[in-house]
Design a protein with these regions (language model features):
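Long, compositionally biased non-active-site segments enriched in small/hydrophobic residues and glycine
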Residues: 1-184
Length: 184
């Protein structure tokens, strides 16, 4: 499998008893299904969020203990989309009453946490290098939005996709105790 597919599949070894799905069933709707009591579930009065990423954190102040590995890894790095979702949710709550203009900006803002984290340091580094002055100028003037008229969006997307999986990308590595602000 490719890395993309392998990260999203759970394969069970049918020759091992601990992988026998028939062991599940008590408390579930059907034999072989993981019971709801062993799945991530949270009821809160403030918020829960889900970005189709990791089960272990759906509220910044309340994390799940490790659950069945079938639900995915625990305490691992969140996607930038998930981190951005938490930031936007916290901003909504801190901002008070939601009006139409604010809802529209949050929904259609086309912003990028990757750009917020990377553009300024990249522009500073590439300006000192001198080989990519034109690219640096475009990114330095970019509004860091992905709007039709945002000059620099395509350049950043190409740049980001070429470096996003580098092991040396961040100066502060992922920390499971600070998953919403690391890596950076």
């Amino acid at each position: 499998f490719s890395g993309l597919v392998a990260d999203r599949l759970t394969l069970l070894d049918g020759s091992r008893s601990e992988c026998d799905s028939d062991q599940y069933g008590e408390g579930s709707a059907h034999q072989g299904l993981l019971p709801a009591s062993e799945q991530a579930s949270r009821t809160r009065r403030d918020y829960v969020t889900n970005s189709n990423d990791r089960y272990w954190i759906s509220n910044a102040s309340s994390r799940y203990e490790a659950l069945s590995p079938i639900l995915g890894p625990h305490s691992n790095q969140l996607s930038l989309r998930t981190r951005s979702n938490f930031q936007e949710t916290e901003a909504i709550l801190a901002g008070g009453k939601m009006d139409r203009a604010r809802a529209k900006e949050l929904t259609f803002g086309n912003k990028s946490l990757a750009a917020e984290l990377m553009v300024d340091p990249f522009v500073a580094a590439c300006n000192s290098d001198g080989r990519f002055v034109g690219n640096c100028a475009v990114l330095g003037e970019w509004d860091q939005r992905f709007e039709a008229g945002s000059k620099g969006a395509y350049l950043f997307e190409r740049f980001w996709n070429s470096i996003r999986n580098r092991n040396d990308l961040w100066t502060v590595p992922f920390d499971a105790e600070n998953p919403l602000t690391t890596p950076r």
